[in-house]
């Protein structure tokens, strides 16, 4: 008989991957880099009214004589958009004196780090074996595994 090939993922869906500390850190760094490279822009649909709802119109009746000319600030914001890295280079902070974004840092903490649950925020004595997140109860572990474990949360 010929053995049927199966996918590695479909063998045991209940089995969780266990990552070591270095793999967890690489994963977090990769996710943070993806967030940094993400092209943030204002919501293009923010000014549009929602369908099916009538929104009240607020007009200034006192200033009916003169109409104010609308500024083209949004046009320049969109046309000359810069990312965070470009703004830092433009400020030339590496040669500036005094504390700035590149040179400011806090001293080491005087007390050890307190572990808090990633789900509810209470003190947590347990750690997830897959991703290293903290949890306090079995209920929080279940919520973590269903919604957060090895997903895009930092």
From Swiss-Prot:
According to the UniProt entry, where is the signal peptide? none
Task: Cite the record's tissue specificity text.
Answer: Expressed abundantly in liver, but weakly in skeletal muscle, ovary and small intestine.
Give the matching Gene3D superfamilies.
3.30.60.190
What is the residue range of the motif Nuclear localization signal? 38-47
- Cellular component per GO? nucleoplasm; nucleosome; nucleus; Swr1 complex
* CDD domains linked to this entry: zf-HIT_ZNHIT1_like (cd21437)
Biased composition of type Basic and acidic residues is found at 14-23
- Residue numbers carrying Phosphothreonine: 103
Q: Name one Pfam family in it.
A: zf-HIT
Lipid metabolism is among the record's keywords: no
> Where does this protein hold Zn(2+) 2?
128, 131, 144, 149
Q: Which GO terms describe its biological process?
A: calcium ion homeostasis; chromatin remodeling; heart process; hematopoietic stem cell homeostasis; intestinal stem cell homeostasis; muscle cell differentiation; negative regulation of G0 to G1 transition; negative regulation of transcription by RNA polymerase II
A single GO molecular function, which one? histone binding
Q: What does this protein do?
A: Plays a role in chromatin remodeling by promoting the incorporation of histone variant H2AZ1/H2A.Z into the genome to regulate gene expression. Promotes SRCAP complex-mediated deposition of histone variant H2AZ1 to lymphoid fate regulator genes, enhancing lymphoid lineage commitment. Recruited to the promoter of the transcriptional activator MYOG at the early stages of muscle differentiation where it mediates binding of histone H2AZ1 to chromatin and induces muscle-specific gene expression.
Q: By what name is this protein known?
A: Zinc finger HIT domain-containing protein 1
Origin species, per record, is Homo sapiens
